[in-house]
Amino acid sequence: MDQIEAMLCGGGEKTKVAVTTKTLADPLNWGLAADQMKGSHLDEVKKMVEEYRRPVVNLGGETLTIGQVAAISTVGGSVKVELAETSRAGVKASSDWVMESMNKGTDSYGVTTGFGATSHRRTKNGTALQTELIRFLNAGIFGNTKETCHTLPQSATRAAMLVRVNTLLQGYSGIRFEILEAITSLLNHNISPSLPLRGTITASGDLVPLSYIAGLLTGRPNSKATGPDGESLTAKEAFEKAGISTGFFDLQPKEGLALVNGTAVGSGMASMVLFEANVQAVLAEVLSAIFAEVMSGKPEFTDHLTHRLKHHPGQIEAAAIMEHILDGSSYMKLAQKVHEMDPLQKPKQDRYALRTSPQWLGPQIEVIRQATKSIEREINSVNDNPLIDVSRNKAIHGGNFQGTPIGVSMDNTRLAIAAIGKLMFAQFSELVNDFYNNGLPSNLTASSNPSLDYGFKGAEIAMASYCSELQYLANPVTSHVQSAEQHNQDVNSLGLISSRKTSEAVDILKLMSTTFLVGICQAVDLRHLEENLRQTVKNTVSQVAKKVLTTGINGELHPSRFCEKDLLKVVDREQVFTYVDDPCSATYPLMQRLRQVIVDHALSNGETEKNAVTSIFQKIGAFEEELKAVLPKEVEAARAAYGNGTAPIPNRIKECRSYPLYRFVREELGTKLLTGEKVVSPGEEFDKVFTAMCEGKLIDPLMDCLKEWNGAPIPIC
């Protein structure tokens, strides 16, 4: 620590004020902000998850993280809060200063004056003033019907309590340490005050909701809380369950203002939202890579040179992550072989939803990352008014309660979330559409009778609904500011409103990523089924060709024997699901193409075709009859083997870096291939994945997909 000289408010005498060397070198904080953006986004998310899983959150005022807020917000969780004992002296000093200054007759806002536009009023009854502050701010509406809920979720309340305590620990607010200990006891005993969902403009802080925390601490008769088992508690019952032996607090001058005049509700909820948004951003990157796998895409879109020439770090990282997933992928090796067959008859490039996914996701990741840093600064800030500067013996009147960083960050995050959802919808729409999905069945149907199986059709409709609502939520909140409180609060951040809307948005994005993930797993299984069915068809066509086409009537070698190689090429080229529900149908492409091969050979048979013994045309009927007798049974047997887990060709996904995610959905959650022949609906499987996602169980398999990534693109050779 270095020291700089500062003049006391009365002038004349100078005092030494401790300032970190880093502050002197970076007085505007831009350097620190830039330093915080170093390293990869993925590493940052991993660190966030690590902090989320720590058993204890040690609060000291300046090191609280998004992951820690998310951990404490978990209702019924086991993570505990501990207050840094080193903060006690600073907190006490500011509290003592308020009492001493009032005794000396110092005129301070919110201590001897009225509030806001009526701060011209004066009183010497500081305790009564704080009591009245809490009373008039208890202006929220809860309602008492089951159809509507106007109560802030417990998770958001817990986040707000944690963030507010963190702010007050820094010793600039004039509040007793014992009050902070009481809030901590409530947190550690899973007791949450009931806060109204609406009623704050997050400037002057989140006055209305925070007043209900103060109301519980002071034992207001209208105060309620929710206990560890979800039971409703009075203030008295809440104190008893939390083991707070001091009884209700009689607020001293400034303490009511210290409790309510801050941005903790908006920034607390923003922290929860950003934890989820960061995980969803990584999931979107990985899902885009798996989408490329099941779509038989071309991995060229991840080539590092393309993205290095664009310069944007979010894009470069998104591409590098996808490149890592696709590097060595068994699907990509197979896709390359497929693309090499008849290349001039296929699109040269994949569609935008696949090919430009790094360019699309990159800016969204940058926005979410920037918002994360902004909110992390906010939850470690001192954001009430006035600020008590004991070192300079003065109360500083300012506006740190203005939650603009929250409103702006949440608006930006919500826009990014909407863009991620739009990409997922575009990818999902391609996945279920047999015009675009490179051979997968329409609607990802898996039954032998597609006329009675419509697969993910309902899911696609639901995805359109989710995406539409998400795009609507992308509209900004901060452009709807209204002048409030007798035009004193004439500009205000709407931070909590924006956080709430972003919470809604991330919840909808989770619905979309859930649906997309289950759809991708369905596609993985269909590719597995496709391979086994194709091999069965190849084997059967080969056997029938050998039996029917090799020899003539008298056992002599027949010219038609040369058809077999070209017949097998047809099977390789033809998309299995275009014919496999009725493989020998004359209206389906397989039989048409096979017949065409034999016809072409017959036309090139020359003079020998005129001889009935050597005529290839004469073999067409026998070949088709034999195939009709054998192929449907073999296909049915192949489906049965696949269904009971004895398919001869293993699932390629097991050879891919994306396997941990698939394994989690299929094995750990117990979801199955969806078919019209089964009773299970898509929504039932979606619920399993969505619930696991909301419980944070998807994080480990997601990170397992990337555990070998070294944080850099594959070198350009």
Curated annotation (Swiss-Prot):
Residues engaged in binding (E)-cinnamate: 261, 349, 355, 385, 457, 485, 488
Subcellular location, record wording: Cytoplasm
Sequence positions bearing 2,3-didehydroalanine (Ser): 204
Enzyme Commission (EC) number: 4.3.1.24
Keywords annotated in UniProt: Cytoplasm, Lyase, Phenylalanine catabolism, Phenylpropanoid metabolism
Function (record text): This is a key enzyme of plant metabolism catalyzing the first reaction in the biosynthesis from L-phenylalanine of a wide variety of natural products based on the phenylpropane skeleton.
PANTHER family according to UniProt: HISTIDINE AMMONIA-LYASE
Family: Belongs to the PAL/histidase family.
Record protein name field: Phenylalanine ammonia-lyase 2
Organism: Arabidopsis thaliana (Mouse-ear cress)
